[in-house]
């Protein structure tokens, strides 16, 4: 779970920016996107193969 504790003189904008960065690094939104609909085993294999190709390229 992502939490952001505000400092004494910290503004909402900077706290929101930190929160968005932490959510992005944790991969929470990507996880929500994948779990929005049921993913069949074939789709899962395809997604993992594409990710492996992308990882191998870099």
Curated annotation (Swiss-Prot):
Gene Ontology terms describing biological process: translation
GO cellular component terms, A-Z: ribonucleoprotein complex; ribosome
Keyword entries, A-Z: Ribonucleoprotein, Ribosomal protein
InterPro entries: Ribosomal_bS21 (IPR001911), Ribosomal_bS21_CS (IPR018278), Ribosomal_bS21_sf (IPR038380)
Protein's UniProt keywords contain Ribonucleoprotein: yes
UniProt keyword annotation of Ribosomal protein present: yes
Sequence similarity: Belongs to the bacterial ribosomal protein bS21 family.
Annotated protein name in UniProt: Small ribosomal subunit protein bS21B
Native organism: Nostoc sp. (strain PCC 7120 / SAG 25.82 / UTEX 2576)
Lineage: Bacteria, Bacillati, Cyanobacteriota, Cyanophyceae, Nostocales
């Amino acid at each position: 779970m992502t939490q952001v504790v505000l400092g004494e003189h910290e503004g909402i904008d900077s706290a929101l920016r930190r929160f968005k960065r932490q959510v992005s690094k944790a991969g929470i939104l990507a996880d929500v996107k994948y779990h929005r609909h049921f993913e069949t085993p074939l789709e899962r294999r395809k997604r993992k193969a594409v990710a492996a190709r992308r990882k191998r390229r870099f």
